[in-house]
């Protein structure tokens, strides 16, 4: 086999005399050499245009490859070699042996079988989507394989984009289904190593893993040199190289394009990751250079030098949370160029919403000669005021900051000795100039961004590239694209769909972009909760207290809970404190199977642009279907044109209450609330009367049709805003049709109540009432 020497790369490395290949790895790492062979196996399968004939899919080479590995002497190699048009070795799971190197020769591919049964840990456990759990063997496994290796200029293709035998889905289809459904996919990883001291990967090309490409655990001494990983960016959970609980790791001269972390350090409670060098590499699509999300074993003495990241979702990232955190320190990123990256720099101990006592602490983090050439989101977060992020920015430049987002809090940032233009400010962020600081100069990056290297000697078999999924996925456990809904909204484009996994998201949302959808695939809306505890008193008034504020048009929400729990978190304050769950002033908004929880002033549905005297109001329309709204005083209020279809309206404990406080200002305003086929329920044991509404403005308009009313509804139904002081009830339009239940007492209703005829009811059907000049009919909207 011809052995190339990477002469040009080594010459380039001389430019970086500050980092020999000792670096943080305590070993002296030199370019590997392929061992002599104990046996050479020849391929028996052809694959014209990358397609293996169905008959050949049964002709596995697993047994002969495994026999060769089992019988090869330590220090030697099993070589897989093509012969003529036959260049494919087809295999199920393989087990490496100590001291033995598997070599895939140039123009040869070691291909994974598409039969999921070969990878079962238990019968039927692999190739499925289900609850959390792992059900697959890796394609290549090594435990106790000291001084072994995987080398060669050929490729290992795990065929993540090929349909499974007997099925119509690919491995990657399963991964996408799991992401959408917030489930776990059981798919095989490509290479899994444990206790693999002195293991080396050299020149090999890895393609299309269904799961992680390389994971290394409990190992002292691992080298990946000249490795190429090429997997589509749309293939979920396909990490490149993941060192976990290991030390003395070098990843050098490698090129990685994948659908998840390009390189990710993953310590766990067993041990940390230390003494690692990532040198002279190029990352393309993926999630960048990451540490975490578990850091409870600790990370120290990491050097990342001469790295380009082009087109990834993330750049340099440390991520963890208090449920699995630990100390990350003595980490240096030097001579790094980043462009076309959504999140160029991310340092967060709040990667998920999980709580715990394993605190993620980041200190002695150094960025030296780092240049970010395009806008993105920058995150510099400490855990809290007592556990700040400690980071030094030495000659760090970020272009186009005016179009970037910054999330900075609880950080101690040192600038220099070379001053760049990045100095993140924020709440409880201190910035200190290093002694002797001088103006810096941006790192020159043009020559550092290079095309992905040629894969001419590394064949690829046919498969389907997963389509681009433009949805944004939010998961409280960190398995999505974001752990925060608002962070997703910050980067969302008009028309995007935000898929929120079950969990509790304690935050405040502002939706100011058109055509946004927020939904969960779990039909139990109580499982996906967006909650906060803002109040009118603490936030400048009722209309500034909302957990969710929607000002943009064409908003859609489904299968979620929107809650303001101010009274629960402040039990010492009066129960009547005004605290909104939702404020909606956007037009053509739809809420389906959404729970709105609060007490006083739960849901504000209003028009916009009104002057103080109620003039110039721009009407807005909202449609609420199959939803649940809880509160006690004026908990559905405002002056929009809103329709509540098949909703449950729940009155919570309070000394009296009012469901609506509609606020139509004048007879000409296009405004009113309609409730149709709803149920009016109440907390058990509540005896105080509840009214259907009172008029916040003189021309309040509310209609209840076909509604089942509990006994808590006062027989009068409606009441003046302040009896004896205000006189709006004389000009309101309060109406009912076909009310049922013990609360429906037409003969005792306030005399201002109108009782509709069947003919009059027609004008209050949603397709008529909400039509507007654009003929909007929310009941005919396509299923989201």
PLM region descriptions:
Residues 81-83, 97, 103-105, 111-113, ...:
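Feature marks extracellular polysaccharide-active and adherence modules
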Residues 93, 147-282, 506, 554-650:
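Right-handed parallel beta-helix
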Residues 42, 49-50, 146-147, 257, ...:
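Sequence-level preference for short, compositionally simple segments enriched
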Residues 76, 91, 112-115, 159-163, ...:
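Short glycine/acidic-rich loop motifs that flank beta-strands on beta-rich extracellular proteins
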Residues 76, 86, 92, 98-100, ...:
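The right-handed parallel beta-helix/beta-solenoid scaffold, focusing on the short coil/turn
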Residues 57-64, 103-186, 203-206, 253, ...:
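Right-handed parallel beta-helix/beta-spiral solenoid domain characteristic of secreted/periplasmic
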Residues 65-71, 88-98, 102, 203, ...:
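Short, T/G/N/S-enriched strand-turn elements that build extracellular solenoid repeat scaffolds
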Residues 54, 66-91, 96, 100-113, ...:
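Glycine-rich repeat segments that build the extracellular carbohydrate-interaction surface of secreted
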């Amino acid at each position: 086999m011809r052995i190339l020497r990477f002469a040009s790369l080594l010459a380039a490395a001389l430019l970086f005399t500050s980092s020999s290949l000792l670096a943080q790895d305590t070993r002296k790492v030199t370019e590997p050499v392929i061992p002599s062979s104990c046996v050479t196996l020849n391929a028996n399968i052809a694959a014209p245009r990358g397609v293996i004939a169905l008959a050949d899919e049964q002709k596995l080479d697993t047994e002969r490859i495994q026999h060769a590995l089992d019988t090869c002497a330590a220090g030697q190699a099993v070589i897989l070699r093509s012969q003529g048009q036959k260049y494919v070795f087809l295999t199920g799971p393989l087990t490496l042996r100590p001291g033995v190197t598997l070599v895939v020769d140039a123009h040869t591919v070691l291909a994974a079988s598409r039969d999921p049964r070969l990878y079962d840990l238990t019968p039927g456990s692999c190739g499925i989507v289900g609850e959390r759990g792992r059900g697959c063997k890796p394609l290549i496994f090594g435990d106790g394989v000291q001084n072994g290796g995987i080398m060669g200029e050929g490729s290992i293709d795990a065929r993540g984009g090929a349909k499974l035998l007997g099925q119509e889905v690919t491995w990657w289809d399963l991964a996408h289904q799991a992401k959408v459904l917030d489930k776990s996919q059981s798919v095989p990883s490509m290479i899994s190593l444990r206790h693999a001291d002195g293991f080396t990967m050299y020149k090999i090309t890895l393609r299309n893993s269904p799961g992680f490409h390389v994971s290394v655990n409990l190992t002292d001494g691992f080298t990946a040199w000249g490795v190429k990983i090429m997997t589509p960016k749309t293939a979920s959970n396909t990490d490149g190289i993941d060192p976990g609980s290991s030390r003395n790791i070098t990843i050098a001269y490698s090129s990685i394009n994948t659908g998840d972390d390009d390189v990710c350090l993953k310590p766990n409670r067993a041990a940390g990751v230390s003494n690692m060098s990532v040198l002279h590499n190029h990352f393309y699509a993926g999630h960048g250079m990451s540490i975490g999300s578990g850091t409870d074993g600790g990370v120290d003495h990491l050097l990342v030098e001469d790295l380009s990241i082009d087109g990834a979702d993330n750049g340099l990232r440390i991520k963890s949370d208090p449920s699995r955190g630990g100390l990350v320190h003595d980490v240096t990123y030097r001579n790094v160029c980043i462009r076309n990256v959504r999140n160029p720099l991310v340092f967060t101990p709040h990667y998920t919403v999980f709580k715990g006592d394993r605190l993620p602490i980041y200190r002695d983090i150094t960025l030296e000669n780092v240049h970010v050439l395009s806008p993105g989101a920058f995150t510099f977060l400490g855990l809290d005021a007592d556990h700040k992020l400690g980071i030094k920015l030495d000659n760090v430049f970020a272009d186009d900051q005016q179009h970037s987002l910054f999330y900075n809090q609880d950080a101690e940032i040192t600038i220099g000795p070379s001053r760049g233009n990045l100095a993140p400010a924020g709440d409880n962020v201190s910035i200190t100039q290093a002694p002797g600081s001088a103006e810096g100069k941006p790192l020159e990056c043009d020559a550092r961004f290079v095309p992905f290297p040629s894969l001419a000697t590394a064949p690829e078999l046919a498969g389907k590239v997963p389509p681009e999924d433009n949805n944004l996925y939010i998961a409280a456990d960190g398995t999505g694209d974001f752990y925060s809904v608002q962070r997703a909204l910050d980067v969302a484009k008009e028309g995007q769909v935000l898929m929120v996994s079950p969990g509790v998201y304690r935050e405040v949302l502002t939706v100011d972009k058109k055509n946004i959808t927020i939904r969960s695939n779990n039909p139990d809306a109580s499982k996906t909760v967006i909650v906060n505890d803002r109040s009118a008193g603490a936030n400048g008034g009722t209309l500034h207290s909302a957990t969710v504020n929607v000002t943009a048009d064409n908003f859609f929400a489904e299968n979620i809970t929107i809650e303001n729990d101010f009274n629960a978190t402040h039990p010492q304050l009066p129960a009547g404190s005004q605290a909104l769950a939702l404020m909606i002033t956007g037009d053509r908004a739809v809420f389906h199977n959404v729970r709105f929880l609060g007490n006083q002033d739960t849901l504000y549905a209003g028009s916009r642009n009104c002057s103080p005297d109620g003039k110039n109001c721009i009407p807005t329309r909202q449609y609420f279907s199959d939803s649940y709204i809880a509160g006690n005083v004026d908990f559905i209020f405002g002056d929009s044109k809103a329709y509540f279809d098949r909703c449950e309206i729940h009155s919570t404990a309070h000394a009296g209450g009012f469901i609506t406080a509609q606020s139509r200002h004048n007879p000409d305003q296009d405004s009113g609330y309609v409730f149709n086929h709803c149920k009016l329920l109440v907390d058990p044991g509540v005896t105080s009367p509840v009214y259907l509404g009172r008029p916040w403005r003189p021309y309040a308009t509310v209609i209840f049709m076909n509604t089942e009313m509990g006994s808590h509804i006062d027989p009068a139904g409606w009441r003046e805003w302040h009896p004896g002081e205000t006189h709006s009830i004389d000009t309101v339009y309060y109406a009912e049709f076909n009310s049922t239940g013990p609360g429906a007492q037409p003969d005792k209703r306030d005399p201002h109540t109108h009782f509709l005829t069947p003919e009059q009811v027609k004008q209050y059907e949603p397709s008529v009432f909400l039509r507007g000049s654009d003929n909007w009919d929310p009941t005919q909207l396509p299923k989201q």
